[in-house]
């Protein structure tokens, strides 16, 4: 799938094609108008292969070969020993258009990648480097998978040295626009606001967040819970189908969302067979992020959200069960029509037919979000349910979508809609 507007912005090329002539034209225009980097021009075979695979027009056996090249963008991943960083590496290992040049960590520095993430095969077994500006200098892009509050300083130092380096923050440091919201929920100094990495979010002005990611150099990857709730509710609020002041979301979430650090309540003997609510009463840090997204999607203030996550004994996954009052006469068909209007053309979002609802098992390992909806006429409530893999579509997959857009690559390169089962 070649979305030429991502490379050039030329309206006459704003179509899908796997034609090599069209790809050449895209890159030629990008080179002339936007001064495309040399690696982009040199990687036509890689990108054409990715476009064909992503559009379903070719099989791996017929796609153009990668070939030998040293011109692929060089990527550094920081926080590789954690779940988010490890999942990012897993996806990048299958990306045909980039090179994982450096893998860094903090407490695990000095170990081989195979010691902390034996499931990841990069074709070699790198030693995890120390996390420092010196280590990260000289890359085309840096992915920061660090705990909240730890990305701001190193990101600022990297950008000060090289304004052209692309930095993606998988933590929360650069998601919120409001310094007051940041202070209320994170109790530290606000590091500023970066371009938000949720390509599918349709904004109040009719554009998508995707447009802002093309060529971006500072990207804040969304929170996993925020993605599940925001993409479920935004189309329905924009269509005026829900009571915006009485929104509720209850989210069974997998334990990987709590991170990899050893904690008593995350031990198998504590967690197995038990469901545990946490951050009850509006204290979860994704609440202001969801409300920010809903404001941007509708162009209106005043949304109120009761948000309750619940840890359940599964490794990965989020099932966001969202409810809100609806006006009498609003039907399930109305909800599904609004969702389809927003997402019918979105590669990684599936709106399910009436009477069908998603499960976390259907999205495990895939960069997909599945949504079902229904109206309960007896209670006057709408129920909208979305499911995603918190480590893929909720984190690393969203990062890779944004990385592709920022680098001028087809958005779906290196990502799959196919989940693991059972």
Indicate residue ranges for each PLM-predicted region.
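Short, low-complexity intrinsically disordered segments enriched in A/P/G/S/L with frequent Arg
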Residues: 4, 14, 34-35
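N-terminal Rossmann-like NAD(P) cofactor-binding subdomain of oxidoreductases
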Residues: 39-280, 300, 374-377, 418-422
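Conserved active-site and cofactor/substrate-binding residues in soluble primary-metabolism enzymes
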Residues: 83, 193, 224-231, 281-289, ...
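Oxyanion-binding "anion nests"
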Residues: 284-307, 311-315
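C-terminal active-site/capping subdomain that shapes the small-molecule cofactor and substrate pocket
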Residues: 320-422
């Amino acid at each position: 799938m070649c979305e030429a507007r991502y490379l050039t912005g030329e309206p006459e090329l704003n179509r899908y094609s796997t034609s090599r002539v069209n790809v050449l034209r895209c890159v030629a225009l990008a080179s002339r108008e936007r001064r495309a980097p040399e690696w982009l021009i040199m990687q036509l075979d890689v990108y054409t292969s990715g476009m064909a695979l992503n559009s379903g027009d070719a099989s791996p056996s017929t796609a153009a070969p990668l070939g030998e090249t040293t011109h692929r963008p060089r990527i550094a991943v920081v926080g590789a020993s954690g779940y988010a960083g490890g999942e990012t590496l897993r996806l990048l290992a299958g990306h045909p258009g980039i090179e994982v040049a450096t893998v860094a960590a903090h407490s695990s520095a000095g170990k081989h990648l195979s010691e902390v993430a034996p499931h990841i095969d990069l074709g070699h077994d790198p030693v995890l480097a120390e996390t420092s500006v010196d280590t990260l200098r000289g890359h085309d892009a840096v992915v920061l998978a660090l705990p909240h509050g730890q990305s701001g300083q190193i990101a600022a130092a990297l950008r000060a040295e090289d304004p052209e380096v692309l930095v993606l923050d998988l933590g929360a440091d650069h998601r919120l626009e409001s310094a007051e919201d940041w202070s209320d929920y994170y109790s530290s100094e606000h590091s500023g606001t970066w371009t938000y990495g949720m390509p599918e979010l349709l904004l109040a002005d009719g554009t998508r967040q995707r447009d802002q990611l093309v060529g971006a150099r500072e990207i804040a990857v969304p929170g996993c819970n925020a993605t599940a709730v925001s993409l479920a509710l935004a189309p329905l609020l924009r269509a005026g189908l829900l009571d915006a002041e009485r929104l509720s979301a209850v989210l069974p979430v997998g334990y990987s969302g709590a991170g990899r650090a050893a904690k008593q309540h995350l031990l198998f003997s504590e967690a197995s067979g038990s469901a545990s609510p946490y951050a009850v009463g509006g204290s979860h840090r994704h609440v202001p992020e969801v409300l920010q997204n809903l404001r941007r999607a509708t162009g209106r203030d005043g949304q109120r959200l009761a948000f309750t996550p619940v840890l359940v004994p599964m490794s990965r996954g989020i099932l966001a069960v969202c409810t809100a009052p609806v006006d009498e006469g609003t039907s399930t068909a109305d909800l599904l029509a609004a969702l389809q209007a927003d997402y019918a053309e979105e590669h990684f979002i599936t709106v399910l037919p009436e009477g069908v609802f998603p499960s976390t098992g259907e999205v495990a390992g895939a960069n997909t979000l599945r949504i079902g909806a229904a109206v309960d006429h007896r209670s006057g409530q709408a129920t909208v349910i979305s499911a995603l893999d918190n480590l893929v579509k909720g984190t690393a997959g969203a990062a890779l979508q944004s990385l592709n857009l920022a680098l001028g690559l087809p958005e779906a390169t290196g990502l799959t809609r196919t989940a693991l089962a059972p």
